């Protein structure tokens, strides 16, 4: 056990950014019982977390919102946790399909009170949209420091 004190934002050593990859969220090659267990864990993690500055919800641009995504958005809305949708795998869809998915996503988010209005579009393979995603995170951090 360490007796050293953990750095705090006031020390200037920890900006308070934590990235959490949710297990089994979206697509997972696992038994349904395991996925159900992970889903419950995710919802419990997201509920009542006032310290979450923003959750970035990654949505596969090839498919748009799935039921599991809508359930998570409802949980975030009920918990008043701000979130921003990031469409991923933009390189794997035609431009016209991407534009349609983006428009449908923006239209759907109007009904979600905790949703941040700007939808980001990314491709990890080509790097498109990644600077914008990083910039959005940095802006948010600067607002909170």
Predicted regions and their residues:
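Switch II (G3) loop of P-loop NTPases
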Residues: 12-40, 60-63
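Canonical P-loop GTPase G-domain recognition
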Residues: 92-145
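Short, electropositive alpha-helical surface patch
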Residues: 70-80, 139-145
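Conserved nucleotide-binding/hydrolysis micro-motifs of P-loop NTPases
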Residues: 17, 24-26, 62-65, 89-94, ...
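Conserved ATPase-coupling elements of RecA-like P-loop NTPase cores
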Residues: 28-34, 64-70, 94-99
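Switch I (effector-binding) loop of TRAFAC-class P-loop GTPase G-domains
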Residues: 1-14
